[in-house]
């Protein structure tokens, strides 16, 4: 499987046994001015969701592009 991986947000072949791509987003102290933090990568299983963290998992090549945020009006 190939997934986008941060920090460079470039497509990389996942290590053996890691066939899941994930997109993890969460708020930190700068969330209101910079938007949510984003972490992209490969995993063997979909990571456990923690409070305040949103995780999306998928299993096709490059299915985890960097999220596009809507501008606030």
UniProtKB/Swiss-Prot annotation:
A GO MF term: toxin activity
Main location: secreted
SUPFAM superfamilies in the cross-refs: Snake toxin-like
Keyword Cell division (UniProt): no
Signal peptide per UniProt: none
Disulfide pattern: 3-21, 14-42, 27-31, 46-57, 58-63
Subcellular location: Secreted
GO cellular component, one term: extracellular region
Pfam families reported for this sequence: Toxin_cobra-type
Entry annotated with the keyword Iron-sulfur: no
Keywords in alphabetical order: Acetylcholine receptor inhibiting toxin, Disulfide bond, Ion channel impairing toxin, Neurotoxin, Postsynaptic neurotoxin, Secreted, Toxin
Gene3D superfamilies for the chain: CD59 (2.10.60.10)
TM stretches of this protein: none
Entry comment describing in which tissues the protein is expressed: Expressed by the venom gland.
Family stated for the protein in its record: Belongs to the three-finger toxin family. Long-chain subfamily. Type II alpha-neurotoxin sub-subfamily.
Purpose of the protein: Binds with high affinity to muscular (alpha-1/CHRNA1) and neuronal (alpha-7/CHRNA7) nicotinic acetylcholine receptor (nAChR) and inhibits acetylcholine from binding to the receptor, thereby impairing neuromuscular and neuronal transmission.
Protein name, UniProt field: Long neurotoxin 1
Species the sequence originates in: Ophiophagus hannah (King cobra)
């Amino acid at each position: 499987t190939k997934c986008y991986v941060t920090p460079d947000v470039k497509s990389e072949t996942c290590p053996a046994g890691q066939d899941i791509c994930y997109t993890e987003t969460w708020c930190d102290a700068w969330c209101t001015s910079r938007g949510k933090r984003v972490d992209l990568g490969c995993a063997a299983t979909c990571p456990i969701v923690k409070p305040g963290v949103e995780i999306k998992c998928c299993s096709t090549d490059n299915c985890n592009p960097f999220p596009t945020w809507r501008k606030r009006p």
